[in-house]
Every structure is written in C-alpha cells, then in structure tokens.
Amino acid sequence: MEFSPRAAELTTLLESRMINFYTNLKVDEIGRVVSVGDGIARVYGLNEIQAGEMVEFASGVKGIALNLENENVGIVVFGSDTAIKEGDLVKRTGSIVDVPAGKAMLGRVVDALGVPIDGKGALSDHERRRVEVKAPGIIERKSVHEPMQTGLKAVDSLVPIGRGQRELIIGDRQTGKTAIAIDTILNQKQMNSRGTNESETLYCVYVAIGQKRSTVAQLVQILSEANALEYSMLVAATASDPAPLQFLAPYSGCAMGEYFRDNGMHALIIYDDLSKQAVAYRQMSLLLRRPPGREAFPGDVFYLHSRLLERAAKRSDQTGAGSLTALPVIETQAGDVSAYIPTNVISITDGQICLETELFYRGIRPAINVGLSVSRVGSAAQLKAMKQVCGSSKLELAQYREVAAFAQFGSDLDAATQALLNRGARLTEVPKQPQYEPLPIEKQIVVIYAAVNGFCDRMPLDRISQYEKNILSTINPELLKSFLEKGGLTNERKMEPDASLKESALNL
C-alpha cells in the first residue's frame, strides 16, 4: 500500500524543512583596484561602503575609505602600497577602524592600529573601541574643578591645569615642549601613590606623531627607569610610518584614554605633536585630490583637531565623574603663533603654555613666557594654598618685565623701582627647575611663599637653588601635609614656616 500524505501534513512538512534550512554561505562585497600610487588606492565596485570603514587588500594590507565618489572609492593604505597592483581584489570588513583599550595596554608601546611594537608579545584581556566617536555632550559634562599637577613650579603656580582641561604646549623646536609633557607623566607617580582609591589614579597616554624611533625608544627608557610605565602607555606613529598612520595615531590614543574616562577613572593624553598630524593630513588630502585652502591645508583641518580635542572632558557625576585631560603640542616656526595651525589649536584649547627660544638660551628652563601663557579654566582647580601664595607673583613679574626694559637706559633709579627689579629677578629665578625632577605641590608652595614674601630679596641669585634645597630639607613634614587641605593658609599657618625660612636665608 503506497503512502499518500494529506495536503495539511505536506504543508507542515515543507514549512519545517524551510525553517530548518541552513546555508553556510558568507557574502563579502568586493571591489577591484583601478589605480594605486603614493599610498592612495582608487577602488571600483564597493557601492555599500561606509565612510571611515576598514578594507583589506589581497596582499593582506589594510586601508581606510576616506573619499566616497560616484565612480570609485578613495582608499588610504595603512602601510606599503608596493604589493598592491591594478586589478587586485579589495574586501570590505564591515567595521569602522577600532583599537584595543583597557588596563592591559598599560606599560605597552603600540602602533596607530593598536598592534604591539615593543616585543613583549600579544595583548592580554582587552576590549575594542572605535577610534572616531562623538565627544560627550553638554549635559554629560561638568566644569573642571580637580587639579592635575605637573610638578613644575612655573606651571602649577602661574598656569594651573585641571582634570578634563585641554592645555596647549606651544613653542619652537628645541624649547622643551616634550620635557614639560614627560615631567608631567613622571610627577603622577608620587600623586598616584597618595591616592586612597583607584578613582584618584591618573593614567597617562603618550602619542608620538612623526618622531624619530630613537627618540621614542629613549622616552620608553626614561619612563621605565622611573617606574612610570606601570600607569602609562605609548602610541607611536614614527617618521618612517606612512602618513595615514600619523593621521590616525591621535584618534587611536584618544580612544584608549576614553576607556578610563568612561569608566569613572582619570587619564592624561599627550599629543606630540599635532603640527605633524596636520602635515600628514594635508599630504593625504592633496593625494585624494581634495581642494586645498590656506597654506595648502584642506578646508576641514580645523575640524581635524577640534573633533579630537573636544573628546577631552570632565564627565558629570551621573556619568561616572571620569576625566580625560589633553596636552596637545604644537611646533611653531620662528616663534610665529599667528600661523594657521597654531591659531586653530589655540582657539580650540582652554589655554596655552608658550615657550620661547630666547628664554631657553638665557637659562630660564622651563622657558615659559608667563605673559603669553594662560589657563582659562585651571584656576578653579588650583589648590587654595597655592592660589593664596602666588596670587601677586604674576602681577609682580609683569611689572618687572615692563620696568626692566626701561631700567637698561637709566642708572638713577628710585628705591621702589630698585626693590621691584630686585624682587622680579628672584621671582624669575625661583621657577627654574632641572629636567626629570618634578616637585610635589606642597614643596612648591613653600618655595614660592619664600620668594613672594621677600625671604630671598637680599640673597645672591646663584644661591637661590641652594636656599630652596635647604628649606625643603628643614621644613616640618606635618606643615607640608597641611598645605594640601582645602582650607588653604590661615594666619597661624602663615607664621609657622617664617622662622625656618628666615633662618635658612640668614645662613646663605
């Protein structure tokens, strides 16, 4: 007898077969290389590609889609284009460029794509974050109110920086821009050791753009010897790397820093330097045939830096209260701060530290021009004791510079002018500091207190550094601790250090 299923059973059988039907097919959208040269590939056939999407060439080299045109796509190659030729297949990855992030990155040196280049093996447990994300909105932010100490007397007293601030370091080549950044990283060791919980720790990300490999290796050695690598990571796109990697490195470093910001922790990121990133971006844009503007930079070069620096922020209590502080570095040519890129970045940041070649050669190091340097939001984050101590010093320095220019022409100066010149010379001497020797904030307060209150006025200038060492070795440690309290300097506390400061001054 033949089996003849009923219509209803047949329908059910067919439906179940269709539902359970499984195919292991994976569809990739691919295109072909039309032309290639100078690190730019024109690809035909990738109709559904997204802007900023990562693609993979047949040779294994990766690239990013930057120009989406009617006929083809302009792809910037991350690496050498010598293995790519006309007619090669190009595959979409379906993902926007992302990099590894997390505490596993601490102590490591990676390239702009997050691949380790320090020879310590693969990265352990980490998450991946997109390099290009939207900056936090207004509601998600909070005004800057916590100090970020650099350990430099000239910075912490006159141009204070807060957590979540963007403070530009600007100056000619060889004026000590990187030295300020490195000293800031080294100073966090003692600041982190004082923290009672992890939320007070400040992690550091250093992004080296277009620097020599030997310079980066030297920096790693300095941080390693100071045990600063345990809370730091480096992203390096060196001078020998292609322009696209130099363009991408700051965004990659920022994504790594945002991991801490978004998880209720604090991070500091140093971009050294953004002038080289702008040059790399100009090179890419011109090769992509984008219309040039002022100084041959593309029209969106302002947006290049603004979208990067806006990601540095202090988050509100509702969103975790984390912060990302940015110290971008810009190199000027012959002290011209009114050039295109310097003015752009000055207008984006919350202040700038201006370094001058002339001051550097006169032995004033760090070579900070106090008149041009400013911190627009940092004073809200400055310790009360420091604010009380250095309140008058900036005005006195400004008056000193004004009078010193005219004092060269006249010899018969009245007593008040002579006293002003005398005090100004000492206030110029006190902020001098050797490299890689950051000073704790409470010790800075004592030294500046001594200078502002006239304890150094009768002392020869060459004895001031010795006087500083003497007072720091004899001052009461309990008194130093009291300066860190929020109450600031009371009248009783002001009288306390006076005796030991006078005694040290008399000895010299």
Curated annotation (Swiss-Prot):
Any one of the GO CC terms: mitochondrial membrane
Keyword set, alphabetical order: ATP synthesis, ATP-binding, CF(1), Hydrogen ion transport, Ion transport, Membrane, Mitochondrion, Mitochondrion inner membrane, Nucleotide-binding, Transport
Protein's UniProt name: ATP synthase subunit alpha, mitochondrial
UniProt cross-references to HAMAP family, sorted A to Z: ATP_synth_alpha_bact
Positions contributing to ATP binding: 171-178
Keyword match Zinc: no
Name of the gene: ATPA
Family according to the record: Belongs to the ATPase alpha/beta chains family.
Subunit composition and interactions: F-type ATPases have 2 components, CF(1) - the catalytic core - and CF(0) - the membrane proton channel. CF(1) has five subunits: alpha(3), beta(3), gamma(1), delta(1), epsilon(1). CF(0) has three main subunits: a, b and c.
A matching Pfam family: ATP-synt_ab
Main location: mitochondrion
UniProt function note: Mitochondrial membrane ATP synthase (F(1)F(0) ATP synthase or Complex V) produces ATP from ADP in the presence of a proton gradient across the membrane which is generated by electron transport complexes of the respiratory chain. F-type ATPases consist of two structural domains, F(1) - containing the extramembraneous catalytic core, and F(0) - containing the membrane proton channel, linked together by a central stalk and a peripheral stalk. During catalysis, ATP synthesis in the catalytic domain of F(1) is coupled via a rotary mechanism of the central stalk subunits to proton translocation.
GO BP term, example: proton motive force-driven ATP synthesis
Organism from which the protein derives: Zea mays
PROSITE patterns in alphabetical order: ATPASE_ALPHA_BETA
